[in-house]
Amino acid sequence: MAYYYQNLWIENVNADEGKFTVYNENFFRPSDYASLDICVSVNGKPRYNNGDIDIDGIAPQSRKTFTRPALASKIKELKAENPKAEVTVEFYFKSKHGEPLIDKGQTLAKYQSVAQSYTYPELTAAVDGNAPKVIETDSYVKMEANGVAVTVGKYSGWIDYLDINGKEMLVERESIEPDFWRAPTDNDYGAELQKKFGVWKNPGYQVTSVSHEAVGNSHVVKANIKMDNVKGELAMTYTLKADGTILVNQDFRATKDAKVAEMFKFGMQLQMPEQFNAIEYYGRGPVENYSDRHSSEFIGAYTADVADEYFEYVRPQESGNHTDVRSFKVYDKRTGEGLLFESDAPMQCSAINYLTEDLDDGPSKYGKKWGRHSGDLTPRHLTAVHILKYQIGLACVNSWGAWPLPEYRLPYKDYSFSFTIKKTK
């Protein structure tokens, strides 16, 4: 809200020319109370700062265009040095002298522009090395390569075990599973989405086939799963490459003309042991954000403790999400061991110490306990990780009860998501 209420804006950025326009949206106040700092970042890490730019003399409701040759030169240099990296330009308007309730140097307004787009990895790229070893039994297919062991259950269709250098990456008896449901937010309850989308809480999984084959120096396991409750089918493909990279493909096929509710999420979820207590990600942060609530959070490189990722809303609900994520690492701060998730397009990711069921009050927000608060929650001794292609927005188009705008919803149709899992050490 503060972002869209700000009164100073950047427009018409031409990074290669170091050119931009400042718009003073104030109705009665000239721009003399603020100065402008500019930062240039490469893959979210600051590499250049041009501070204290004088923007005096811009009248209310007026614009002024600036050209900074030094800025243009630095941007061109960084782009040439980092041809596949994302180069962004951050603009910060800061209080020049301070005033009541505002400190000198405090940020009053901000804006981010992309000078060079991110180059996403090619997920299917070939790697060198020996083909994985494979063990098959009546109940599972196990693949091993470069210290990574992946076990796909024939009865579940999921990755039931994931070990790296002999260390278990998943909580015992918990699998890497699809993620379609979220703990309803206050706005969800207002629109009764917890009832309207309820079928996605238990889609009704039934494995119809599991097969596997060698493809070059990789090995591929395919699981086909019926989802009768939502009249769809899920095809899961797990590829273990020679270097230990796991490629996960999640393909949902909807039944044409079927009348099925929209979904909250599309992606995967897993539970990691509690020692994996930190995250490092390149995406929007550091504050949680959602598809229709993310403009104020800049794309950058961030680190955080998992324990701090749940925001204590008055009552428990979905929390901790980050959008436009390029890479997401969950790791043990002591050893650096953990998992790195990447995709070929932006993801939405989170890692908190609560399961969705801990935050979900059911069909009524008073279903579990009248007046339940976030302070009543007890963190679990695990890290719940969500790796998503999509999650619907938070809505609140009116004060309460409206659905998210159409572009921030997930109607019933086909969806596909691919991402990789790599060991961090």
Kindly give the residue locations of the regions a language model identified.
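Carbohydrate-binding surfaces of carbohydrate-active enzymes
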Residues: 1-154
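Beta-strand/loop-rich accessory regions of lumenal/periplasmic or secreted enzymes
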Residues: 73, 77, 82, 118-425
